[in-house]
């Protein structure tokens, strides 16, 4: 099973949503930024690397949510979501065609990649408080 990470980048009660470009697998759907874990890499290190590559930002992980197993027809994935915050930089889409900061109400109008659905539901339900790690 392919290990994939994603980051719920928080800013004032909003999360950063990224739209996959047309012509790419799942093109036009919204997702949380991230990518595949490389061999020998921890999920946390993979997320920090992917967010720097995809958005040009340095981040810090502040918590975790429940992993999601999904199959888009190309083999199963295990999507490992983390909460994080921006340490330096401003997000710019290097691999997506649009970025949008969304709150719980506005994220409902976006069409999300299916594996992100359970993550969104957990975030909206507020069931993540016990999963958060304290920030210094």
Residues of each region from the PLM?
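The catalytic Nudix box helix
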Residues: 32-64, 103
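Active-site-adjacent beta-strand/loop module that shapes the phosphate/pyrophosphate-binding cleft
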Residues: 58, 67-90, 100
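NUDIX/MutT-family hydrolases
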Residues: 83, 92-124
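Conserved hydrophobic "DFG−1" position in protein kinase catalytic cores
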Residues: 9-10, 17, 84-86, 101
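A conserved beta-turn-beta hairpin within the catalytic core of GNAT-like acetyltransferases
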Residues: 24-29, 101
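Conserved N-terminal beta-strand and adjoining loop/helix that marks the start
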Residues: 1-15, 36
């Amino acid at each position: 099973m392919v290990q994939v990470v994603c980051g719920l980048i928080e800013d004032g009660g909003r999360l950063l949503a990224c739209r996959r470009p047309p012509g790419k697998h799942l093109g036009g759907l919204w997702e949380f930024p991230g990518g595949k874990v490389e061999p020998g890499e921890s999920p946390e290190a993979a997320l920090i690397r992917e967010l720097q590559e995809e958005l040009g930002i340095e981040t810090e992980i502040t918590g975790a949510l429940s992993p999601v197993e999904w199959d888009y027809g190309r083999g199963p994935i295990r999507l490992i979501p983390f909460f994080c915050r921006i340490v330096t930089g401003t997000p710019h889409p290097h691999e997506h065609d649009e970025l949008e900061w969304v709150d719980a109400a506005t994220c409902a109008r976006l069409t999300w990649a299916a594996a992100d659905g359970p993550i969104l539901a957990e975030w909206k339900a507020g069931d993540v408080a016990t999963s958060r790690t304290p920030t210094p």
